[in-house]
Amino acid sequence: MKGLVIKNTGSWYQVKTDNGQLVECKIKGNFRLKGIRSTNPVAVGDRVQIILNQEGTAFISEIEDRKNYIIRRSSNLSKQSHILAANLDQCMLVVTVNYPETSTTFIDRFLASAEAYRVPVKILFNKVDAYDEDELHYLDSLITLYTQIGYPCFKISALTGEGVDTIREELKGRVTLFSGHSGVGKSTLINALVPGLEVKTAEISAYHNKGMHTTTFSEMFPVPGDGYIIDTPGIKGFGTFDMEEEEIGHYFPEIFKTSANCKYGNCTHRQEPGCAVRKAVEEHYISESRYTSYLSMLEDKEEGKYRAAY
């Protein structure tokens, strides 16, 4: 029997079979995927084969080939990854310039990870109703930056409804992963997009000005127009999983394009003579914040660490 994994609760997986039945499944035996070192071999969005036993228990016996997936640092094993979701049509990264602030380093690491696994990303700048003039000016500068690179950007307010109808249209016929720091209003936005869903939300910690986690495990919800939303736990950071040092620049589109003009084919864009990327940064053709994010990922790779980006 075939089905779609719609929820992961750690040891159990909820599968929606092709005939619409919801089945609670476990993994059969020491199930592992070849070539993927992760804490969860099965992810929300996976198409799977399940076996129903006479006792009423069910097991996932096989996973169909994935078209893509996206991973983050495992929360408890720093050198292992955790697959957030599989078979995605797009990611929507929810960010805020304050309450709490999403750093450009975090944004860039997420984008690089999505580029590595061939998942298109749209950036949703939430809480636009809450910003002062300086914050709105900064927000506009970020939108200009990321739009020029090629990432669609949207101004929204989950609280007032600004931009929500536009995002709802973007969900039709697509499997969409929603991600972002805790506290950026991701769950509030999902509730606004799909009235009646009632995804749990939380307050911002007044002491740290950071969000408190409300989503514990990834879960998939149907949305009008034959689409699906995948809600994920709030994420603290992304590491350089499965990336070789020389590949990291490939996942920054503007750096990759400019690197064709570097003097050396293996240029890492740090100290090498004739580096077209460093020249482009100096001449403001490439954003200094993006270049700094790139260097931080190189540093992680050199030190063998998987550092959270705040």
UniProtKB/Swiss-Prot annotation:
Tell me the organism.
Bacteroides fragilis (strain YCH46)
List, alphabetically, the GO terms of the cellular component aspect. Answer: cytoplasm
Keyword annotations: Cytoplasm, GTP-binding, Hydrolase, Metal-binding, Nucleotide-binding, Ribosome biogenesis, RNA-binding, rRNA-binding, Zinc
Q: Where does Zn(2+) bind?
A: C262, C267, H269, C275
Could you cite one Gene Ontology molecular function of this protein? rRNA binding
Keyword Chaperone annotated: no
Cite the PANTHER family for this sequence.
SMALL RIBOSOMAL SUBUNIT BIOGENESIS GTPASE RSGA (PTHR32120), SMALL RIBOSOMAL SUBUNIT BIOGENESIS GTPASE RSGA 1, MITOCHONDRIAL-RELATED (PTHR32120:SF11)
The UniProt entry's sequence similarity note says: Belongs to the TRAFAC class YlqF/YawG GTPase family. RsgA subfamily.
* Cofactor binding notes: Binds 1 zinc ion per subunit.
The subunit field of the Swiss-Prot or TrEMBL record says: Monomer. Associates with 30S ribosomal subunit, binds 16S rRNA.
**Binding positions for GTP per the UniProt entry:** N126, K127, V128, D129, G180, H181, S182, G183, V184, G185, K186, S187, T188
Q: What function does this protein fulfil?
A: One of several proteins that assist in the late maturation steps of the functional core of the 30S ribosomal subunit. Helps release RbfA from mature subunits. May play a role in the assembly of ribosomal proteins into the subunit. Circularly permuted GTPase that catalyzes slow GTP hydrolysis, GTPase activity is stimulated by the 30S ribosomal subunit.
> This protein is called what?
Small ribosomal subunit biogenesis GTPase RsgA
